Amino acid sequence: MAVRIRLKRFGAKKRPFYRIVVADSRSPRDGRFIDEIGYYNPIAEPAEIKIDVEKAKKWLSVGAQPSDTVKSLFRKEGIINN
């Protein structure tokens, strides 16, 4: 089972916010997930990001691959350094 850390879309049309979730890579974007580790609201000024650092590091240590967007959010929050 390939596990990914990715965004799950919520909100109204043209007003999205996202939950950062750990999911099987074969699951649909807004489908089943294994664990929720935070949220991202790009509409707020400034953009609002909240991530449970402990859970994020745990999932990264067991091999979960972050999506490109989540990777950039992790860099912004200082969770990964690349």
UniProtKB/Swiss-Prot annotation:
GO terms for biological process: translation. GO terms for cellular component: cytoplasm; small ribosomal subunit. One of its GO terms (molecular function) is structural constituent of ribosome. It comes from the Bacteria. Pfam families: Ribosomal_S16 (PF00886). Keywords: Ribonucleoprotein, Ribosomal protein. InterPro entries: Ribosomal_bS16, Ribosomal_bS16_CS, Ribosomal_bS16_dom_sf. Belongs to the bacterial ribosomal protein bS16 family. HAMAP family: Ribosomal_bS16. This is Small ribosomal subunit protein bS16. The gene is rpsP.
